[in-house]
Amino acid sequence: MAMVQPKSQKARLFITHLLLLLFIAAIMFPLLMVVAISLRQGNFATGSLIPEQISWDHWKLALGFSVEQADGRITPPPFPVLLWLWNSVKVAGISAIGIVALSTTCAYAFARMRFPGKATLLKGMLIFQMFPAVLSLVALYALFDRLGEYIPFIGLNTHGGVIFAYLGGIALHVWTIKGYFETIDSSLEEAAALDGATPWQAFRLVLLPLSVPILAVVFILSFIAAITEVPVASLLLRDVNSYTLAVGMQQYLNPQNYLWGDFAAAAVMSALPITIVFLLAQRWLVNGLTAGGVKG
């Protein structure tokens, strides 16, 4: 026999569902509006959510194709969006891999080894990470300007310089992976040592396979942070062809001519790499975030 819910419980359930729907609508509306702007004729930021007439002109320009106007004029692509997208994926991918590698080895040292000043180093890393990157922009510019004189591939206007700058943001990830490592019983590594494994082999063959969920989380968070970052990339990159998509999209918002439709199409394209990476790694995301809590 089905249980009859009291009216008060039904009302609470209805209100809960209504609030959830309103919350989802508040999140989805800006995204749908950006898509709608990219499908409208002209470069206008205002208008209905559903375009009266769908136009693919902005998408053609973003993909590098010329567009023929009604009067016969040919409009070439104003900016190399696909090149910017590739630059973004390249910089974010290499940065994320480097951050995972550095964070994992540092976290292993803090979780398994004993050395003087370990607690001080951990706290210091976390404190320095609390300050926003914009506070160090002047210092970063001077640093990479000087580094470029000796090591050209990590100087100004190079992707290597941007990647090198992003590798500095590992403190929070070190804490997260350290907490995950501390949840793994050290007896597994001791058993591997009894079988003749070196510390490096125990780390590589025992600890790393058990840490795939948290490594996937760190990779996703690092990838998203790098592909959406603007201040550091806009400071270090000068050449238009070297821009990442997040930096290059600002070129559409010229004070004399706001290209909102083209900007919206490029904005939607910028979300594709993040969506693909998230979908590929989502099965590890919840487990990694749950088990990777910072442990004292």
From Swiss-Prot:
GO cellular component: ATP-binding cassette (ABC) transporter complex; enzyme IIA-maltose transporter complex; maltose transport complex; membrane; plasma membrane
Gene Ontology biological process terms, A to Z: maltodextrin transmembrane transport; maltose transport; negative regulation of maltose transport; negative regulation of transmembrane transport
Spans within the Cytoplasmic topological domain: 1-18, 103-123, 172-204, 281-296
Main location: membrane
Membrane topology: Multi-pass membrane protein
Classification via Gene3D superfamilies: MetI-like (1.10.3720.10)
Result when mutating G196P: Loss of transport and MalK dissociation from the membrane
Name listed for the protein in its UniProt record: Maltose/maltodextrin transport system permease protein MalG
